[in-house]
């Protein structure tokens, strides 16, 4: 998104719209399938030779669940976007797309789960436990922590 400085009045200017999800430039990421449109509500104002932009950003993202490995949709919201850009006299425009992209990526959850009730996958056979139980025989071995019960501290 490019902000044309000549079009910003002294009191500032309001921008609302969306950019295609392609601005996120996500390629070959095993955890993220795709981003939807990046929607923005921004306010830009020139202050002392700078362009100050603040507002909010939202995007839908298709992500892989960290527990069951299925893709699901979640919303990434940035409610406190704030950046100041140098805008000396003679500058025609300021490009802010890279900062919008960066802010959305910083708000993508690192350990995303499709739901709080997700049971994940069986660690032995990899079966999706949300779809049913697996046929693995769980070995009931000795409790490895029971040794600590015998410590006298």
Regions found by a protein language model. Name each.
Residues 1-153:
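Structured interface patches
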